[in-house]
From Swiss-Prot:
The active site is at residue 103. It comes from the Bacteria. One of its GO terms (cellular component) is cytosol. Belongs to the ribose 5-phosphate isomerase family. Pathway: Carbohydrate degradation; pentose phosphate pathway; D-ribose 5-phosphate from D-ribulose 5-phosphate (non-oxidative stage): step 1/1. This is Ribose-5-phosphate isomerase A. CDD domains: RPI_A. Keywords: Isomerase. Disulfide bonds: none annotated. InterPro entries: NagB/RpiA_transferase-like, Ribose5P_isomerase_typA_subgr, Ribose5P_isomerase_type_A. GO terms for molecular function: ribose-5-phosphate isomerase activity. The lineage of its organism: Bacteria, Pseudomonadati, Pseudomonadota, Gammaproteobacteria, Alteromonadales.
């Protein structure tokens, strides 16, 4: 089974967590694209979706899935999204696709976070994948200096502007043993919008595509 086939299996397995007549929170990325394809098969049974990125919004609209603005929605029963890394405590690094802030907002509104990944994303310690930090453009150099003090090697992601008009610093060479504390510490730096650690709001259910099929993990 190829990596993409494992992503597809995880994406389709997430349909089980979609409630009839609900509005579904939808994330961003290659695995989520498979979930969107799956969601389109039951679009008549749901009210619609809230999206965490312009890319996912475009794909859902093209497939005829109604997309709502989050400000018009009081509650989401489920949020389905991928991860760049996830550990055994269901803490994640996300934001490889630069949609981390909107992903974090939609995840905060949802009752349940279902994370869909292939088996290459499971790790014991977070940090092998560089940690994305969304930054107000004028604060880029200051924030980079502060991240160095925390032990990281920040690199400006050139040519990338987030959907919110900000820039991304990718922080390399961090072994993250206390994700919750580091998430809060980085978010306290003036000029940081948010960072790609999803630890204070981790996943509730993990669906992992493996060569043997989809593995379900709950904390």
């Amino acid at each position: 089974m190829t990596q993409d086939e494992m992503k597809k299996a995880a994406g389709w397995a997430a349909l089980e967590y979609v409630e009839k007549d609900s509005i579904v929170g939808v994330g961003t990325g290659s695995t989520v694209n498979h979930f969107i394809d799956a969601l389109a098969t039951m679009k008549a049974d749901i009210e619609g979706a809230v999206s965490s990125s312009e890319a996912s919004t475009e794909k859902m609209k093209a497939l005829g899935i109604p997309v709502f603005d989050l400000n018009s929605v009081d509650q989401l029963s489920v949020y389905v999204d991928g991860a760049d890394e996830i550990n055994g405590h269901m803490d994640m690094i996300k934001g490889g696709g630069a949609a981390l802030t909107r992903e974090k907002i939609v995840a905060a509104v949802a009752d349940k976070f279902v994370c869909i990944v292939d088996n290459t994303k499971e790790v014991e310690v977070l940090g092998e994948f560089p940690l994305p930090v969304e930054v107000i453009p004028m604060a880029r150099s200051y924030v980079a200096r502060e991240l160095v003090k925390l032990g990281g090697d920040p690199v400006y992601r050139e040519g990338v502007v987030t959907d919110n008009g900000n820039v991304i610093l990718d922080v390399y060479n961090m072994k993250i043993f206390n994700p919750k504390a580091l998430e809060e510490q980085i978010n306290q730096i003036v000029g940081v919008v948010t960072n790609g650690l999803f630890a204070n709001r981790g996943a509730d259910v993990l669906l992992v595509g493996t060569p043997e099929g989809v593995k379900t993990v709950k904390p």
